Design a protein with these regions (language model features):
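Rossmann-like NAD(P)H-binding beta-loop-alpha module
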Residues: 114-138
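Glycine-rich phosphate/pyrophosphate-binding beta-alpha loops
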Residues: 263-275
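Phosphate-binding site of ATP-dependent enzymes
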Residues: 150-237
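Protein kinase-like catalytic core scaffold
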Residues: 141, 200-201, 245, 258-261
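Structural motif
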Residues: 62-64, 142, 176
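Conserved N-proximal alpha/beta basic substrate-recognition cap immediately N-terminal to
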Residues: 9-120
């Protein structure tokens, strides 16, 4: 029987679905917080401290979330995931994929490098350079926190409005600016859930404003997970090396679907409410096949 560690802070809805999915596939899964893990070096053994896995390491690790904390704490927790990979334990998603997705600038770079269409993006620390770039942009731009999620900290800036000062919250020293793609009303975008670099399910998110995240009141509707939408989402997952992820896309009148972001630790409760497949079971199937 395979032993799975699910790294999460608490047994939320997602974890309960995953525990059930693994049990139905005759695998033993347990939830462990990365806060409780560590290193013990200098003696015998792997050098890793994972509660419940003192005698032997798990067969596979699945990361639901990494707790927030100081820069040192988050770096340490990522180091634990790096160490598991160095020891030959499959990690979904591993620290490399998480780092690539948490940092929006690296996500955008990897999408660009892979030839995946995205909105024009400019990332610098210097406010004057950002203002100079904005003067070449004919329309609104969106300023995003480099490490933001769930629609928090976004601001839409019209031509002629001042470029924000990157100091302080929410930008914290870095200006990540992206050309606004959307409508004057009837705002919507798409979330595609990928597992094993395959597009598994999709939804349309309709918002009361241009920020359509479910956490910001967006309404979920099913969408066909086919064609160009599925193709681009799968390509984005491959570009960042994610074993499972949520890919956000928007439709441009001229360029078609564009990839906005990739989330390496996605929630899927909203998508599950309109999906025909069990997404937790799809994740379990992928993890147990590694």
């Amino acid at each position: 029987m395979k032993r799975i560690v699910i790294f999460a802070d608490e047994p939320d809805w997602h974890c309960r679905r995953l525990l059930k999915a693994f049990a139905q596939r005759q695998a033993a899964a347990s939830i462990v917080s990365l806060r409780k893990c560590g290193f013990s070096l200098g003696g015998d053994g792997s050098g890793l401290l994972i509660p419940g896995f003192e005698r032997s390491l798990p067969d596979v690790a699945l990361v639901r979330n990494i707790p927030s904390g100081s820069f040192e704490q988050v770096t340490f927790r990522l180091s634990l995931l790096h160490a598991l990979r160095e020891l030959g334990i499959p990690v979904v998603n591993d620290a490399r994929a998480i780092e690539r997705c948490v940092d929006k600038s690296m996500t955008s770079f990897l999408l660009h490098r892979a030839g995946i269409p995205t909105p024009a993006t400019f990332v610098v620390e210097d406010q004057e350079r950002a203002a100079s770039w904005r003067r070449t942009e004919p329309a609104d731009v969106v300023a995003k926190p480099l490490f933001g999620a769930q629609g928090r900290g976004l601001s839409r800036i019209a031509p002629g409005e001042p470029t924000p000062d990157p100091g302080g919250d929410p930008l914290r020293g870095v200006l990540y600016l992206q050309r606004y793609v959307g409508r004057a009303r009837d705002w919507q975008d798409y979330r595609v859930f990928c597992v094993g670099e395959v597009a598994a399910a999709a939804m349309v998110r309709r918002g009361a404003s241009w920020v359509t995240n479910v956490a910001r009141g967006g309404v979920c509707e099913p969408a066909p997970c086919t064609g160009r939408l599925a193709e681009l989402a799968a390509a984005a997952a491959a570009a960042v090396g994610a074993g499972y992820c949520g890919v956000d896309l928007i439709e441009d009148a001229e360029r078609g679907f564009l990839v906005l972001e990739v989330n390496s630790m996605p929630a899927w409760k909203g998508l599950q409410s309109v999906a025909e497949i069990d997404l937790a079971d799809r994740i379990a199937h992928h993890v147990l096949g590694l």
